[in-house]
Amino acid sequence: MNLAEICENAKKGREYALLGNYDSSMVYYQGVIQQIQRHCQSLRDPATKAKWQQVRQELLEEYEQVKSIVSTLESFKMDKPPDFPVSCRDEPFRDPAVWPPPVPAEHRAPPQIRRPNREVRPLRKDMGAGARGLVGRAHQISKSDKAASRDKDYRARGRDDKARKNMQDGASDGEIPKFDGAGYDKDLVEALERDIVSRNPSIHWDDIADLEEAKKLLREAVVLPMWMPDFFKGIRRPWKGVLMVGPPGTGKTMLAKAVATECGTTFFNVSSSTLTSKYRGESEKLVRLLFEMARFYAPTTIFIDEIDSICSRRGTSDEHEASRRVKSELLIQMDGVGGALENDDPSKMVMVLAATNFPWDIDEALRRRLEKRIYIPLPTAKGRAELLKISLREVELDPDIHLEDIAEKTEGYSGADITNICRDASLMAMRRRINGLSPEEIRALSKEELQMPVTRGDLELALKKIAKSVSAADLEKYEKWMVEFGSA
């Protein structure tokens, strides 16, 4: 990409805009914006790419200003005096023997006819590939015009020099580049960035109890390709997607956040409500916009929770046309996000993680794209004891508590069930202390009076109140599906 050619085209666009030749100015602006876009795609340094994106945004703003001027001028040409209706009372008396005056002809501005200009020079054959689509100059600038616009040219040249200086200096302020949502509704882009993008979730492997096999598989599928990009190439390329299957409350979302934290990637937490809209075609746009944003903020982890609600089996009798279009767009986008391929930058990997409680309802094509399908089981006895320690590490415990004994009594409980037991047990002392007190007395209690240690009786009482949320029949269905379709 010839940088001098980019600067020359930007200079010409501004020069024509200052002289009032807006058509030629818009052509040059369009060309230079396309050149910068192609140049940004070839860059590898994030700091340099961010500076080029900033220059492109400034040129887009100038182009929009020229475009608004052209539309304003066109509106002046198309305006005509309003026809005021004349009421029947104001109509004068007409003699039938006298002809009425002729109806005034409607005057409209004649269409502009572009006549050939003898002073127009032909296009140079040695123009770069990025400027071949540009239209030649409409008018040659005369010497008098150049003398009149010399001061304006100096100002435009100063802005070009400033943009080049910013790109050469690099991103010294450390700001995160902003996604350019050109072609999309601004509200859609802002909603996705506000509701989905989560940088550095701060969930580590140590915050998740047990699940050692799942952690090992996720490290190999997601984390290691980021650490060893030269190794994971060719047949060793990273997996396109990972599906986590298991009963509810086993830590699938926590695993996805831990993956994003360990990789240092941008984390997109997507649900079915995020990618649905009541307007026709908006859902497909949201899916495409999501993956474009993921490629922009790469390396990225897209976690689609409850994916069976978005991409269930196609061809059923109760399937709607809009739902089928969304599924097709999702499948197309997922097939195009394979990360570290031969010709792609390994640091720009987009990993798709998905979780479901109903794997038997997922479409076959989606199951093929999610190449790794791992089972997230209920915690073991060791995992339950570790989970009790993690959940109760912020509260004071009675010395007589043996968490291993409590863990033996929670056979068949999920991780969410054990967390609920710990939360309920930590509130037992407070409930006993405020029993029978008035609101004024409760507000007068000191903080030390409420910070009572959790006893063994509190945990056993909470265990009696909270039952299991997963049945043995459901566990059997998960294990049967993994035997048939698992890919661990």
Curated annotation (Swiss-Prot):
GO terms under biological process: microtubule severing; spermatogenesis
SUPFAM superfamilies attached here?
P-loop containing nucleoside triphosphate hydrolases
Compositional bias segments (type: Basic and acidic residues): 142-167
Q: Does the keyword Transmembrane helix apply?
A: no
**Might you give the EC number(s) for this enzyme?**
5.6.1.1
Q: Which CDD domains match?
A: Kp60-NTD, RecA-like_KTNA1
Could you tell me which residues carry N-acetylmethionine? M1
Spell out the reaction equation it catalyses.
n ATP + n H2O + a microtubule = n ADP + n phosphate + (n+1) alpha/beta tubulin heterodimers
List where in the cell it is found: Cytoplasm, Cytoskeleton; Cytoplasm; Cytoplasm, Cytoskeleton, Spindle pole; Cytoplasm, Cytoskeleton, Spindle
Q: Which residues carry this modification: Phosphoserine?
A: S172
Q: Does the keyword Cytoplasm apply?
A: yes
The Swiss-Prot or TrEMBL record describes its family as follows: Belongs to the AAA ATPase family. Katanin p60 subunit A1 subfamily. A-like 1 sub-subfamily.
**Protein role:** Regulates microtubule dynamics in Sertoli cells, a process that is essential for spermiogenesis and male fertility. Severs microtubules in an ATP-dependent manner, promoting rapid reorganization of cellular microtubule arrays. Has microtubule-severing activity in vitro.
What's the name of the protein? Answer: Katanin p60 ATPase-containing subunit A-like 1
